[in-house]
Amino acid sequence: FELPSYKVRYGNSLTLSMFLQGPRLIATYRKELKEVDRIVKEWQPDVIISDNRFGARHKDTHNIYLTHQLNIQHKKKSIALFANLLHRRFIHRFDECWIPDNKERDLSGRLSDNSEIRIPCKCIGALSRIKLSLEDPTIELLVLLSGPEPSRTQFEESIISNESLSQKIVCIVRGTDSKRLKNYPANFTIHNIVDQEELTSFINTSAAILCRSGYSTIMDLQDYDRPKYYIPTKGQTEQEYLAEYHDGKKGVKVLKNGQNI
């Protein structure tokens, strides 16, 4: 089954982006509820585990909401307050909440503070498809591109124009099948989309990694004890918080677009 995509786009202002996209997101949420209702009537499941999808629940099932973001962070307290009130309104329609982090919440920090959540919550540990077994490096820098457009392409452009990488063995995983940019340096190896086995191999044979500070990536790299460079997506307050929270821990260094490595 494939539920409708929210197709969220992030601009420089998260607040403005969400406001402009609000009507479309609400319409998608309603479609999601209808599709889940159809699936439940056809297959009659007992439990639904929803990965951050507000509409993936049903009155006839036990509904589990999976998220690490129970306490949205924003520089403006009024915006954080409103966002959290709205988010909790949706969360409380579920029966319980699972948090993909350890009991100490070392990965999510304040994001997973559940003190205001009225349904049962439990930490289930980090979720990752990557099995780390570090080997002698053959890649000096592995670049993992991700996220919505246009920020993904802007990130890619900043990497290929970074003069500090001109003498390094660089491997880029673009994370998309979209048309490649022109004029990649000769010392760059480019891959569009790779499978789990290939990605694991690249990570295990890299001397350092440059990527966004998305939570899925942070979970994948939690035991990677070589240098990790995070560049948060501008306007994504979650990534900005996570980058700041992890900066200086376990080999993490936060950079700005275009900054030398």
Per-range role (PLM):
Residues F1-G22, I190:
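Conserved nucleotide-sugar phosphate-binding/catalytic loop shared by glycosyltransferases and other
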Residues F1, K122-G125, I190-I193, V252-N260:
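Short acidic-hydrophobic, aromatic-tinged amphipathic segments that line or gate anion-handling sites
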Residues E198-Y241:
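A donor-sugar binding/catalytic signature common to diverse glycosyltransferases
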Residues K59-C123:
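Active-site-proximal region of nucleotide-activated glycan assembly enzymes
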Residues S112-D113, K122-A208, I218:
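Donor-nucleotide binding loops and adjacent catalytic segments primarily
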Residues E42-Q44, R93, E140, N204-T205, ...:
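Alpha-helix C-terminal capping/helix-to-coil transition sites in glycosyltransferase folds
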Residues S13-G55:
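Conserved nucleotide-sugar donor-binding subdomain of glycosyltransferases
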